[in-house]
Amino acid sequence: MEGVDIPGRPSPWRVCVTRPQVHPINAKVAPMPGATSHVPLLSVVIPTYNRDALLDRTLGTLARQTTAPEDFEVVVSDDGSTDTTRDVVRSYEDRLRIKYVFQEDLGYRVASARNGGARLASAPLLAFLDTGVLAGPQYVQSVLAAHAGPAPAKVVLGCCYGYDPRNPHPELHSLVEEFPPEEAVRRVGDAPWFQDMRLPEFTAVDFDLSRMHMPWLWFWTLNVSLPAADFWRVGGFDEDFTGWGGEDIELGYRLHAHGIPMTVSRESWGIEAPHERTHEANVSSLMLNCDRFVRKHPSLLPELFWAVTNRGIFGSVETERLRFEEWASQARGQQVLDEIAIGLDTLPPSQHTQRVAVFGSGTEGLPTAPRQNVELFLCDYDEGVLARQESRDDGAVSTWHLSGLRTPWPDQHFDLVIITSRMDGPRQAWGEAFTKEAHRIASSVVEPSLSGD
């Protein structure tokens, strides 16, 4: 395992990747009758683990594409299956340009599996499909079209009918068992229960993701495509993300931060076939990965992603962002220097450097005569406030665009957290969440505006 630095980013933007040995299903994949040796236009990467029957269905839909089979390839990346997955892949060698890569089962490592598949891919475009996604017959054609033309798309989020793991519809199973994907869409394509659960978010911006502040929230790799060069430019999937959930959104965050635009394609659709899920385990795993997200990208938006996901209200991240913008506007100009001084006065004398975090630091978060041996971490949800913050000559001050709902620091990292009155607005909505987080990271917490000091 090694780290890849993301150019132009500080150390948190270091992506963990592995270099596993790949094992193509044959030393040489026999060409299909009539196939040419030209480089495929698209590589479809499918991670899988012990879902041979679902994989068979996904590959079956890719074998009936309107695009000539020699123009695209399929790479199945196996996360350590013990079922007949390898045999399923072999059964498609005469119908698809297909490759297979296997990695040892060391737990849920879908990020590593996708990277392994992407390394084996040879096309300039990568598409990621989840096992169990039933591609429409024009899926490949539509992906290629979306990335072509005078203004080709960079990242394309393909729609996925039937995807709502929280509330799977009882009719979905019989529908996809009885009909091919295109007939299923013809019959119930307009039914509310059949829609991609992201549809309300896309509709709200007329499917123009440039109008979204956080399009990366909807970068879900059950159906997505992008140039291979852009995928590797940002480091691919971060393999520190193990277990279910979040690794795709974190990649979307880095793509967006690099200025790579995202679009939605309703034409390159698939249907997610229903399958068993371990919902409680998935939620627990997702929260661990949300925590990793905050530690790797310590700023307000990943913090809000963690906070709303922790409350089970994932779709409201944008709502919370707007609320914090309003609270920042209301608190602009509010000075809390006296409150910070009161908090610092509670520190006992020490010969060692003491670490102090301030939630709601404001513009002037530095005492005129700062206490010696104190390292200040000034946190505020108003990024404009932090941009105006002056640093101290000795470098003992750092600024963080965080509210305090979830911070990147380990338990008991600080000697003291000071929560100021600039947090009054957020506290009305989030209650004791800030105090709870403060007690997690510090041995002492002071809230001068609440104590009456």
UniProtKB/Swiss-Prot annotation:
Required co-factors: Mn(2+)
Entry keywords, A to Z: Antibiotic biosynthesis, Manganese, Metal-binding, Transferase
EC number from the UniProt entry: 2.4.1.338
GO annotation terms (biological process): antibiotic biosynthetic process
Catalyzed reaction equations: validoxylamine A + UDP-alpha-D-glucose = validamycin A + UDP + H(+)
The protein's role, per its UniProt record: Involved in the biosynthesis of the antifungal agent validamycin A. Catalyzes the final attachment of glucose from UDP-alpha-D-glucose to validoxylamine A to yield validamycin A.
Example GO molecular function: metal ion binding
Stored Pfam families: Glyco_transf_7C, Glycos_transf_2
InterPro entries, per database record: Galactosyl_T_C (IPR027791), Glyco_trans_2-like (IPR001173), Glycosyltransf_2 (IPR050834), Nucleotide-diphossugar_trans (IPR029044)
UniProt xrefs under Gene3D superfamilies: Spore Coat Polysaccharide Biosynthesis Protein SpsA, Chain A
Family label: Belongs to the glycosyltransferase 2 family.
The keyword Metal-binding is assigned to this record: yes
Protein name: Validoxylamine A glucosyltransferase
Domain comment as written in the entry: Instead of having the common DXD motif at the position 130-132, it contains a DTG sequence, which may provide greater metal ion binding flexibility.
Residues annotated as transmembrane: none
